[in-house]
């Protein structure tokens, strides 16, 4: 119920026939039926390129423009989504290197993720091994920095040696998971 998959001429890679505004509205309506107000859509650069090439998005813009010609660009696409649907488009462009050293996108080219306003979850700090060890050791000097980085300093004798260990346990939570909607717009 939080996932919609487009097929055939509805896919956003079919620039002549696709209607991304109507598809986004369908997802927004599904969320509203559950009491969720969506505020943002995360997409890849390739998806943004498909939106720029969409004839229906161009027609939405032309319908509000007194001139017969427009230059379609990312800013116009973002503007029409904001004005028509109150959705901010976020293009996620970051890459990582895979095991073969090739650049890979974090965000897939086939998906659009719709998000509500605000935080999707929290960070929770757990008891780290250093904290646990400090509870039972009198020889360790343990301090906590910022929100959960633990620093343990121990002294060893013969030979004289100072050992410093740093650790932290951070666990993400996803309380707003039921407020996130996915649209698979391309194969």
Model-flagged regions — what are they?
Residues 3, 7-9, 15-18, 58-187:
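Sequence/fold signature of self-assembling virion shell proteins
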Residues 39-44, 90-92:
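A structural signal for short, well-ordered beta-strand segments and their strand-loop junctions
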Residues 35-37, 160:
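Short, well-ordered loop/turn elements at secondary-structure boundaries
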Residues 1-33, 42-62:
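Alpha-helical scaffold segments that mediate packing/assembly in large oligomeric complexes
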